[in-house]
């Protein structure tokens, strides 16, 4: 009896050892574009695994400005002067939607590409957003509300409105193509803050749900996705969906899991521990980011160290943040050094280990 019991224990031990010795199967998170470039696939998978780390798990980010208007490397320089470190992500906006121009596509400028290419080659990741001019007008008017009937005309490529949209998209795609040709993956964030009432592509009234409007927005988002992906064959984009934290209907506009790689919140706040929407967005089962952040009252008194502490305590699935520039910047507020030097924060130069991304933690 004793011998049988001993043999049984030995068998159980050997079985347990075999299970423990079996390597953990790697879980790969791929971009929604099945034809994505290998580097883009690698970056997407690496980003998605960041929450598994115990440190170096939240990419720092900064907005560099609007191309050919305010964009420069000055924001990165200010942050480096304040902290000794540089943001891992650097953002540019291709669209100056407020400009009154002869042709609406003239509001699109991609001259920040040279700096973004250099940033990538020196260990950073570019992000591109679009404050698109309003195709219901000849140019400008990015904050002028439109009716749903006007929205439908914008979606129709045979109308003057639709042709204006297409002209802008063509020029944007040309700029993105230049980045792809250089092997540069891009965090691409079109049509942001759609649940707010300030941009033409979003709602028209404060927290008033409009199901037709929501449907039109989804059609517009998908139109842009299919144009960039299928028509233009751009395979280096990581698609980012980013509603506003201070408005309702954060997930109502979600175009679907097949069109979004990363979900996030644009959040301007005074209390970093009271940002709305984290649970709603993470329930979509996509990597989560604070896609645009800054203090609600921009007077230099905001403490960014509280923000990274809040991420650690309340929003631990966060993979990156992108702070706005000018008076919202960490460089002109408090706690910039604590934010960038926190053990959770990952900065430019810490993404790559030689020619390979730093190790993934399963």
Predicted regions and their residues:
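Aromatic-lined carbohydrate-recognition surfaces of secreted/lumenal glycan-active proteins
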Residues: 62-63, 189-191, 221-249, 288-298, ...
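Loop/turn elements at helix/coil->beta-strand transitions in domains of secreted/extracellular proteins
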Residues: 54-58, 85-88, 122-127, 181-187, ...
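Substrate-binding cleft of secreted/luminal carbohydrate-active enzymes
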Residues: 54, 58-64, 291-362
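Alpha-helical scaffolding within the catalytic cores
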Residues: 43, 70-79, 110-114, 172-174, ...
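Sec-dependent N-terminal signal peptides of Gram-positive bacterial secreted proteins and lipoproteins
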Residues: 5-22
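Substrate-binding cleft of extracellular glycoside hydrolase catalytic domains
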Residues: 99-230, 234
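Glycoside hydrolase catalytic-domain groove-lining segments
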Residues: 248-300, 338-339, 343-356
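N-terminal module-boundary/linker segments of secreted carbohydrate-active enzymes
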Residues: 22-107, 308-309, 350-362
């Amino acid at each position: 009896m004793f011998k049988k019991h001993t043999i049984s224990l030995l068998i159980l031990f050997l079985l347990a050892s075999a299970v423990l010795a079996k390597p953990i199967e790697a879980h790969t998170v791929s971009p929604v574009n099945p034809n994505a470039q290998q580097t883009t696939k690698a970056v997407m998978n690496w980003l998605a695994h960041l929450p598994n780390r115990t440190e170096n798990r939240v990419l720092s980010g900064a907005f560099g400005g609007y191309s050919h208007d305010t964009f420069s490397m000055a924001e990165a320089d200010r942050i480096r002067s304040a902290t000794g470190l540089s943001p891992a992500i650097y953002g540019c906006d291709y669209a100056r939607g407020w400009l009154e121009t002869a042709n609406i596509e003239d509001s699109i400028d991609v001259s920040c590409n040279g700096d973004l290419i250099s940033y990538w080659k020196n260990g950073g990741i570019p992000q591109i957003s679009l404050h698109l001019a309003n195709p219901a007008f000849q140019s400008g008017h990015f904050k002028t509300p439109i009716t749903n009937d006007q929205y439908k005309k914008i979606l129709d490529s045979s109308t003057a409105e639709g042709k204006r949209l297409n002209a802008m998209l063509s020029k944007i795609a040309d700029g993105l193509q230049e980045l792809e040709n250089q092997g540069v993956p891009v965090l691409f964030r079109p049509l942001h803050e759609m649940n707010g009432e300030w941009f033409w592509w979003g709602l028209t009234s404060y927290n008033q749900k409009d199901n037709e409007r929501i449907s039109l927005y989804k059609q517009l988002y998908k139109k842009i996705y299919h144009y960039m992906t299928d028509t233009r064959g751009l395979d280096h984009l990581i698609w980012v969906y980013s509603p506003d934290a201070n408005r309702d209907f954060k997930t109502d506009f979600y175009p679907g899991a097949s069109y979004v790689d990363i979900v996030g919140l644009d959040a301007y706040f005074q209390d970093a521990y009271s940002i709305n929407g984290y649970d709603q967005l993470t329930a979509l089962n996509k990597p989560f980011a604070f896609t645009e952040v800054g203090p609600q009252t921009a007077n230099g008194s905001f403490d960014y160290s509280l923000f990274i502490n809040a991420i650690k305590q309340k929003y631990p699935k966060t993979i990156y943040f992108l702070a706005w520039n000018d008076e919202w910047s960490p460089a002109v507020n408090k706690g910039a050094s604590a934010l960038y030097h926190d053990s959770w924060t990952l900065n430019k130069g810490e993404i790559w280990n030689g020619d390979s991304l730093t190790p993934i933690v399963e």
